């Protein structure tokens, strides 16, 4: 095994100019991540200089077998924390051979929204809080939980320390460091309310980069849990009953919100979000009705609300934002399995571009 370990950690840059590029894309379910690697003649830092590629879309539920070719368009580059050296991770979106975006390509429409002059002028910032649950392989049960049983009730696990409270910290810390190495703007991690559940935060990130970074961070997390023999779940309510669900809260601000008088801009934006509540809920993740019950720090899925420091509301405004008269707000509705391209662009579209009837 030592020879295998040596090869896994082998530094290619000592012997060749060639690099390995791992092309990453979203599969047919909208949450599954796929990837494959190719050799390139030398280092690349601009995604526009990377070659397009293709794959068998019939094996990812994205194309029929009789016309299975799907084209990968490179969009963002990150350093590869697994192969290191000059090797890279490449976030791609997917198109037909004729250049039409596939239905699962949510980046395409998001990029159009973020390139709109009115949106670009507002320099939208996002901070995404990605929650997830670590599961024991083969039994679909949270890490650290007794098989067929339950741990003690919630209370000591949030930001908890100790072998009886924090399950999987090595995975979480490895992911944190790997994301920093990759160039992802990861800003923190913490243990969550339900044991076996964790959160990482990405941001502040501007526009489309928030979605690119979340997908890259999810990919790295999937790879690390693969190595650890643990399964990561983005299900918004993995365990029924008196246990917290998993969300992906989206913190958002525009240039106008961050300037003096921004609190009034925030309140107008929240009013718009309330008027389009149903449209947002429909796009905020599958199975979210199991999570947004009005309990466990959530709002009822059918009722829009907002408040200052209220974690039981749809939209939360921080005390500092209220006091300073400017800042940001938090949309607490997105589920952990949301598509970050959809959520970030929809918030920008509603608050900046959409006009009240």
UniProtKB/Swiss-Prot annotation:
SUPFAM superfamilies: Glutamine synthetase, N-terminal domain (SSF54368), Glutamine synthetase/guanido kinase (SSF55931). One of its GO terms (biological process) is glutamine biosynthetic process. Residues 106-357 form the GS catalytic domain. GO terms for molecular function: ATP binding; glutamine synthetase activity. InterPro entries: Gln_synt_N (IPR008147), Gln_synt_N_sf (IPR036651), Gln_synth/guanido_kin_cat_dom (IPR014746), Gln_synth_cat_dom (IPR008146), Gln_synth_gly_rich_site (IPR027303), Gln_synth_N_conserv_site (IPR027302), Glutamine_Synthetase (IPR050292). Residues 19-99 form the GS beta-grasp domain. It is found in: Cytoplasm. GO terms for cellular component: cytoplasm. Its EC number is 6.3.1.2. In pea there are distinct isozymes in leaves, roots and nodules. Irreversibly inhibited by the herbicide L-phosphinothricin (PPT). Belongs to the glutamine synthetase family. Homooctamer. This is Glutamine synthetase root isozyme A. The lineage of its organism: Eukaryota, Viridiplantae, Streptophyta, Embryophyta, Tracheophyta. The gene is GS3A.
């Amino acid at each position: 095994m030592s020879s295998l370990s040596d090869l896994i950690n082998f530094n290619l840059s000592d012997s060749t100019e060639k690099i390995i590029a791992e092309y990453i894309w979203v599969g047919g379910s909208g949450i599954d991540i796929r990837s494959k690697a190719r050799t390139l003649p030398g280092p690349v830092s601009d995604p526009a200089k990377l070659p397009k590629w293709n794959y068998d879309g019939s094996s990812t539920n994205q194309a029929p077998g009789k016309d299975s070719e799907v084209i990968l368009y490179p969009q963002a580059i990150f350093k590869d924390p697994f192969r290191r050296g000059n090797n890279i991770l490449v976030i791609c979106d997917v198109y037909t051979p004729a250049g039409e975006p596939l239905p699962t390509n949510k980046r395409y429409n998001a990029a159009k929204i973020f390139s709109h002059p009115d949106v670009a002028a507002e320099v939208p910032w996002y901070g995404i809080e990605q929650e997830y649950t670590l599961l024991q392989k083969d039994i679909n049960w949270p890490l650290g939980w007794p098989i067929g049983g339950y741990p003690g009730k919630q209370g000591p696990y949030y930001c908890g320390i100790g072998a009886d409270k924090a399950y999987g910290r090595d995975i979480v810390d490895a992911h944190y460091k790997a994301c920093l190495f990759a160039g992802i703007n990861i800003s923190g991690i913490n243990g969550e309310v339900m044991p076996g559940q964790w959160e990482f935060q990405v941001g502040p990130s501007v526009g489309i980069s928030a979605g690119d970074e979340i997908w890259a961070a999810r990919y790295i997390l999937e790879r690390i849990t693969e190595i650890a023999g643990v399964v990561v779940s983005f299900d918004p309510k993995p365990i029924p009953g008196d246990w917290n669900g998993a969300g992906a809260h989206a913190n958002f601000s525009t240039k106008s919100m961050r300037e003096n008088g921004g609190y009034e801009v925030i309140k107008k934006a929240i009013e718009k979000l309330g008027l389009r509540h149903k449209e947002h809920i429909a796009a905020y993740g599958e199975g979210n009705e199991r999570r947004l019950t009005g309990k466990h720090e959530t709002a009822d899925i059918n009722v829009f609300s907002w408040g200052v420091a209220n974690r039981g509301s749809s939209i939360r405004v921080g005390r500092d934002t209220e006091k300073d008269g400017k800042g940001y707000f938090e949309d607490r509705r997105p589920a952990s399995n949301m598509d970050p391209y959809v959520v970030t662009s929809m918030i920008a579209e509603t608050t900046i571009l959409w006009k009240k009837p």
